[in-house]
From Swiss-Prot:
This is Fructose-1,6-bisphosphatase class 1. Mg(2+) 2 binds at D103, D106, E268. The gene is fbp. The keyword Hydrolase applies. It comes from the Bacteria. InterPro entries: FBPase_C_dom, FBPase_class-1, FBPase_N, FBPtase. One of its GO terms (biological process) is fructose 6-phosphate metabolic process. Substrate binds at D106, G107, S108, S109, N196, K262. Belongs to the FBPase class 1 family. It holds the Pfam family FBPase. It comes from Shewanella sp. (strain MR-4). HAMAP family: FBPase_class1. Its main location: cytoplasm. Keywords: Carbohydrate metabolism, Cytoplasm, Hydrolase, Magnesium, Metal-binding.
């Protein structure tokens, strides 16, 4: 089996980007160790602090954020970083080539119940000039690499550098990420969907109707039965989609009219959308392709619908959009 370093060399990924990816991977090993120790190390539970989104921070949110920040500061390739747990962008190295956006511990509410969590990251080119928030406001199409590390029964890294999606598994004895799936592929059709049903009454009408039709199964207009899955961590639900197909959505809702969207564009939706597209799936807000969005702020939120291509198209048809054919540019 190829190690991660050997794989990056075989794919001719340039030296500086390879170095950055290896730094992220090495840091995830340390995060995996911290997650495994959990209560034994006294790192479970919440703090009295809130992040910029007004969410209560878990102890491990802060610990893992600091671990990634510290590692990227000494890596040498990073110009700046943006994190779910940081109010503002952080300048790292004046000579760095890359910007890194990350969610250090996605699904951290699962920590206290010993369920799935993960790290999500996105790598963008660093523009010339002074580093500001505007430096980061690039569409997802500009991503040079994206991935996540899933901390589950095995620690797994899903990675794309624009050459498909590869899956690596952390060997418990050698502590090396080894290539275990060279070409992850999302089946175009599915009978599984993932959504937080407790928000049903707050969804827009198109999503209400779409989910209602899925629940009707064989006697409904879809004429087949669907199963629902929900892990309450995007990283876990998207991993399932990449592994065996499905559709994952966190749609627009009016539960809090000031916050109609849940997931963050720069360090959740964009990297996951790139992985999904590279594996043959699709990713949309319901009204536009996620990777085509021009961001307006670092912590911008968006609706997310992603997964098996034909099922995403079916969902979008309820929104009055036909994505069954790729749009052509004049």
């Amino acid at each position: 089996m190829q190690t991660l370093a050997q794989h990056l060399t075989s794919k001719a990924v340039n030296e500086s980007l390879s170095q950055l990816i290896l730094t992220l991977a090495d840091t995830s090993k340390a995060i995996s160790h911290a997650v495994r120790h959990g209560a034994l190390a006294g790192v479970l539970g919440a703090t009295e602090q809130e992040n910029v989104q007004g969410e209560t921070q878990k102890k491990l949110d802060i610990i893992t954020n600091d671990m990634l920040k510290d590692a990227l500061k000494v890596d040498g390739t990073v110009r700046g970083l943006a994190s779910e747990e940081e109010d503002h962008v952080v300048e790292v190295s004046a000579n760095g080539k890359y910007l890194v956006c990350f969610d250090p511990l996605d699904g951290s509410s699962n920590i206290d119940i010993n369920s799935l969590v993960g790290t999500i990251f996105s790598v963008l080119p660093a523009p010339a000039g002074e580093l500001t928030e505007t430096s980061f406001l690039q569409s997802g199409r500009n991503q040079l690499a994206a991935g996540y590390v899933l901390y589950g029964p095995s620690t797994m890294l899903a990675l794309t550098t624009g050459q498909g999606v590869q899956l690596f598994t952390l060997h418990p004895e050698t502590n090396e990420f080894l290539l275990t799936n060279a070409a992850m592929s999302i089946s175009p059709d599915t009978q599984e969907f993932a959504i937080n049903m407790s928000n049903q009454r707050f969804w827009e009408a198109p999503m209400q109707t779409y989910i209602a039709d899925l629940l009707l199964g064989k006697i409904g207009p879809r004429e087949k039965s669907f199963n629902m899955r929900w892990i309450a961590a995007m990283v876990g639900d998207v991993h399932r989609v990449l592994s065996r197909g499905g559709i994952f959505t966190y749609p627009t809702d009016n539960k809090d009219p000031k916050k109609p969207y849940k997931l963050r564009l720069m360090y959740e939706a964009n990297p996951m959308a790139l992985l999904v597209e590279q594996a043959g799936g699709k990713a949309s807000t319901g009204y536009e392709t996620i990777l085509d969005i021009q961001p307006t702020q670092i912590h911008q939120r968006v609706a997310v619908i992603l997964g098996s291509a034909n099922e995403v198209d079916a969902c979008l048809s309820y929104h009055g959009i036909d994505y069954s054919e790729e749009p052509t540019l004049d």
